[in-house]
């Protein structure tokens, strides 16, 4: 396992539409391992492969919270070629952030419940229902696979401010 660099806004790669994974290979398994290590190190609860410059339809997630003793039992989840096949009319609002848009958070409204179809690391196609933060995170990460960022759900004014801030920061950093 190794840490991978997380690409940061305004990097244009974040707007790429990721390609489907044809088969779960040792290279895909290595990518998943690296994504988990990178996500945990950041720290974050979700990561799309495109965020580590791999335009493949792979996401990793772990919504585990510390227990009363302060210990966190990890609950790693992998979704290969995920797609939302159903969503509720009911909406919910969560404050979202993104490892590719560091230290910026805004409330985003999304369907409260979704049904997702995906392939697991064993190559088995599965379907799963998700609600609450789980549903929000799945939608956020699948958006990444389609070149969509959570700031795209904000007003034009807020979105433009965020883009300006991160574009200036990238110029200062010499990118």
Swiss-Prot record:
Cofactor descriptive note: Binds 1 Fe(2+) ion.
EC number, as in UniProt: 3.5.1.88
UniProt xrefs under Gene3D superfamilies: Peptide deformylase
Binding site for Fe cation: 98, 140, 144
GO molecular function: metal ion binding; peptide deformylase activity
Domain of life: Bacteria
Catalytic activity as recorded in UniProt: N-terminal N-formyl-L-methionyl-[peptide] + H2O = N-terminal L-methionyl-[peptide] + formate
Active site: 141
UniProt keyword annotations, A-Z: Hydrolase, Iron, Metal-binding, Protein biosynthesis
Cofactor(s) for this UniProt protein: Fe(2+)
GO BP annotation list: co-translational protein modification; translation
Free-text function comment from the UniProt entry: Removes the formyl group from the N-terminal Met of newly synthesized proteins. Requires at least a dipeptide for an efficient rate of reaction. N-terminal L-methionine is a prerequisite for activity but the enzyme has broad specificity at other positions.
Family the UniProt entry places it in: Belongs to the polypeptide deformylase family.
Protein name: Peptide deformylase
UniProt source species: Bradyrhizobium sp. (strain ORS 278)
């Amino acid at each position: 396992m190794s840490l991978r660099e997380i690409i940061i806004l305004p990097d244009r790669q974040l707007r790429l539409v990721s390609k489907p994974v044809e088969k779960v290979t040792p290279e895909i398994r290595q990518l998943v391992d690296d994504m988990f290590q990178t996500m945990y190190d950041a720290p974050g609860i979700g990561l799309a492969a495109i965020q580590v410059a791999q335009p493949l339809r792979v996401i990793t997630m772990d919504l585990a919270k510390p227990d009363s003793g302060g210990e966190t039992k990890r609950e790693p989840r992998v979704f290969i070629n995920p797609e939302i096949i159903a969503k509720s009319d009911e909406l919910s609002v969560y404050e979202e952030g993104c490892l590719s848009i560091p230290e910026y958070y805004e409330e985003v409204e999304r369907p409260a419940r979704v049904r997702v179809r995906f392939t697991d690391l064993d190559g088995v196609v599965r379907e799963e229902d998700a609600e609450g933060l789980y549903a929000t995170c799945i939608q956020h990460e699948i958006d990444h696979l389609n070149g969509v960022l959570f700031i795209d759900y904000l007003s034009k004014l807020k979105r433009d401010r965020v883009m300006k801030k991160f574009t200036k920061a990238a110029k200062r950093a010499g990118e």
